[in-house]
Amino acid sequence: MAKKETKGTQTKTAGAVKAGNGNYYFRIAELEKVAAGTGYSTSHGGVVEGDRMLVGWIHKPRGTGSRMHSHANEQFNYVVQGTLRCEIDGVKSLAPAGTLIYVPANAPHTMVATPDEDVIFMAIKDLSQGIIGKAVDGTMSGPHYDPGFK
């Protein structure tokens, strides 16, 4: 369904597929997996970028996830499978399948798959930057692992 990337169709997220110019339908779960949090998260999955928005079909292995980070783009995550343990701007919650999560632009946040099963979620962001943010502590020293999951 998705065409190969061609000249003039650069994306902000390395490895993402560019939508438009006849490229309108995507089997997002089958796209090449790209890192969706290099240096601070275990998240990875297929990503499609339009002109102003991106959508990712993102996977987090159980017991792993992101360290506290932020990014200039606001974000919605819809949890499809599993449960995320979240903290957004100081507010903690569990987000099971069926939950829509909102992350304001520049809000510090972390999301970790609970130990019982892997998480799949759909990420939707504006394209003020790509899918990857920056860790709040200023380091890109790796993702979060719950004890026993590294």
Located regions from the model:
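Glycine- and acidic-residue-biased ligand/ion/polar-headgroup-sensing regions
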Residues: 73-74, 78-84
